[in-house]
Amino acid sequence: MEEKEEKKVNTEELKNEASTTVNQVKDTIKNVDIKKDSIETKGFIAELFKDPLGKIKEIVDKENNQYFKYAIIILVIWVVAELISRCFSVGPIWGLSSLGSSLMSVIKATIAPICSILVMSIIVLVMNSKNKKSLTTIITTVTTANIPLVIASVVSILTIFGSSISTITIPFTRLCSAVSIVLMYFTLKSIFGEEKNSEFIKKFALVELVYYIAYIVFSLLNIYI
C-alpha cells in the first residue's frame, strides 16, 4: 500500500515538474533578448571553462532562472547545428517517398539533442530522492555538462565544405565527448549532493546504465540521443 502511494506521489511530482518546466520554457522564450542574452551566454561558457566545477556547483545551489535561459540558448544552438549538418548530409531526393524519408531523418536528428537532455534530466529527477532539485535546474546543469558536445556539433558543420575535414572533426568530437562525460560525472555528483567519489560512482554508473537503455530504445526509432 505504501509503495503504491509512493509511486502515486512520484508520478504527481513528475507531472507537476513537467508542467512547471513547460511554463518556464514558454516564459523564457518570450523574454529572450537575442543580442543581450547571446553575449551573456558567451560569458557564461567562458566562466565555465575557467572554473567548471565551481560553476556547476553554483548553478545547482542557486537555481537561478537566468542560467536556465542560457541553457535554452545553448540547446537551440545545438539543435540548429544538428539541423544544418543533417540538411547538408542528405543526398539527392527523388520522388515523394525519398522526400518523406529525408525529411523524417532531418527531424529525428534535430530533436535528438532535446531528447538527450530530457531523458537524462528525468532519470536524475526520479533517482535523486534525497537531495531534491527542480527539473529546470537539472536541465540547466545537464545542458551545461553537454556544452563540449554542442561545440563539437558546431565544429562538425565544417564537414559540409569537404569530407577530408572529418579527419579533424572526428577526433575533436571524441575529445569533447570525453570531456562531457567528466563534466556530467561532477554535475550529477553535485545534484545528488554526494561528497565521496567512492559512494557516488555506483549511482553514476546506474544513471548511465538507465540512460543507455533509453538510448537503445530511442535508437530503434533512429533517434540517436
What do the PLM-derived regions correspond to, one by one?
Residues 107-121, 145-153, 176-181:
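Generic alpha-helical transmembrane segments
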Residues 1-43:
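Low-complexity, intrinsically disordered extramembrane tails and loops of integral membrane proteins
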Residues 138-152, 206-209:
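Transmembrane alpha-helical segments of multi-pass membrane proteins
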Residues 80-89, 115, 119-127, 151-159, ...:
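Alpha-helical membrane-inserting segments
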Residues 74-78, 145, 176, 208-211:
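Hydrophobic alpha-helical transmembrane segments of polytopic
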Residues 156-225:
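Terminal transmembrane helical module of multi-pass membrane proteins
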Residues 31, 58, 89-93, 128-132, ...:
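Perimembrane helix-loop junctions in membrane proteins
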Residues 34-136:
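Selected alpha-helical membrane-embedding segments in polytopic membrane proteins
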